[in-house]
């Protein structure tokens, strides 16, 4: 099976220049592909696919425009991957799965340096370093995290990315699938929410990490840093003496705080999923939440976004497939919170402010725990 490993790297100054040059070229090619297809559309011509654009770029455009020779100085695999990503963006737009593709902006868009294993000497990994095509050996900050090549593991492909002044490598490694022992326990249901991140049907409650003093302190620092950055931009508009270098320094501070908060939230999700899977349930049932609809509520949108429900579902699906656990997804219209787990009566007048479920049969239970138990026992579901 293929598994991705992402860790921070410590490149040299020369390697940093190559990474910046490759990422900048990939961003330019992505935007050029979008612009070229827009021109063809305005001229009444047909859409150009990624393969056709790659042939046209190398055989017609670059020979006639020698001033763009720098495109050939970076890895061809990275350039082709940028074209494929742009073609995928158009394909999603044509199938009404996303909006029209937008240009990638420097410093704001997520662009990566893609690499692939072309020969046996490429993508070789040791305990403390990894060999990347066009970069050579790059030191790893977390030693031993990526499986070493000497142990028989093969890196198929990967990508180098930047975020908040740090450099990361993501490697797709071919590893043997773990063998399921078959000693599963009873199935569980998980109710996700804003008061608590997750409530499991066995009574386990995972707290909302965004309500901790640690996150609130970082968010307070972030607000101050953003106000400071905003004042620098305002002073620049007024013509006052504000250096661009100071703006870049303050922008990096804001990015680092964003990155720190994101890492804490992601780490919390990973730990929750790991703890749930280690109980070895026969099945896990979750609800198909309407995240896009919840985000339209301006009073709840920030809280919903900070919980990262979609990331939780994606990682839980991967982990369940890895350990042979069945992941069940219940329809979003299933009234898990309104059904009494004792007598199956539906309480239609249940409000969002009612945190305790009280049924006419005498059953009294926490609202989220009652919903988790109903999800566990749901009979209509889809296997993810």
Question: Where would I find each of the regions flagged by the language model?
Answer:
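Surface-exposed helix-capping loop/turn segments at secondary-structure junctions
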Residues: 38-42, 94-100, 282, 320-327
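Well-ordered beta-strand positions in beta-sheet-rich domains
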Residues: 4-8, 137, 157, 187
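A generic secondary-structure signal for well-formed alpha-helical elements
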Residues: 30-37, 41, 90-97, 196, ...
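Gly/serine-rich nucleotide phosphate-binding loop at the start of the catalytic core
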Residues: 1-80
């Amino acid at each position: 099976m293929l598994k991705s490993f992402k860790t921070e790297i410590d490149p040299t100054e020369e390697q940093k220049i190559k990474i910046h040059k490759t990422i900048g070229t990939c961003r330019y090619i992505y935007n050029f592909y979008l612009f070229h297809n827009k021109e063809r559309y305005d001229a009444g011509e047909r859409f150009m696919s990624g393969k056709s654009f790659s042939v046209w770029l190398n055989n017609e455009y670059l020979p006639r425009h020698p001033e763009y020779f720098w495109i050939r100085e970076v890895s061809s695999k990275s350039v082709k991957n940028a074209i494929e990503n742009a073609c995928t963006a158009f394909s999603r737009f044509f199938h009404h799965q996303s909006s029209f593709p937008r240009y990638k902006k420097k410093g704001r868009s997520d662009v990566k340096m893609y690499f692939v294993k072309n020969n046996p000497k490429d993508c070789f990994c040791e305990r403390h370093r990894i060999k990347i095509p066009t970069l050579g050996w790059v030191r790893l900050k977390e030693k031993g995290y990526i499986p070493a090549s000497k142990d028989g593991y093969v890196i198929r492909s990967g990508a180098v990315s930047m975020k908040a002044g740090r450099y990361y490598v993501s490697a797709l490694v071919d590893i043997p699938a773990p063998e399921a022992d078959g000693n599963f326990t009873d199935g569980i249901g998980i109710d996700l929410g804003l008061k608590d991140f997750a409530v499991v049907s066995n009574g386990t409650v995972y707290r909302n990490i965004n309500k901790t003093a640690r996150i609130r302190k970082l968010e307070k620092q972030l607000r101050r840093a953003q106000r400071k950055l905003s004042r620098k931009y305002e002073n620049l508009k007024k013509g006052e003496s504000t250096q661009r270098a100071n703006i870049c320094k303050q922008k990096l501070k804001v990015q680092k705080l964003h990155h720190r908060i994101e890492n804490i939230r992601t780490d919390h999700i990973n730990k929750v999923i790991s703890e749930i899977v280690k109980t070895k349930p026969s099945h896990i049932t979750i609800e198909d939440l309407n995240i896009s609809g919840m985000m339209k509520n301006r009073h709840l949108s920030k809280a919903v976004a900070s919980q990262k429900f979609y990331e939780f579902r994606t990682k839980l699906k991967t982990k369940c497939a890895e350990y042979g656990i069945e992941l069940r997804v219940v329809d979003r219209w299933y009234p898990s919170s309104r059904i009494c787990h004792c007598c199956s009566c539906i309480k239609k007048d249940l409000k969002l402010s009612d945190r305790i479920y009280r049924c006419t049969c005498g059953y009294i239970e926490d609202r989220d725990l009652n919903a988790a138990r109903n999800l566990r026992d749901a009979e209509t579901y889809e296997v993810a």
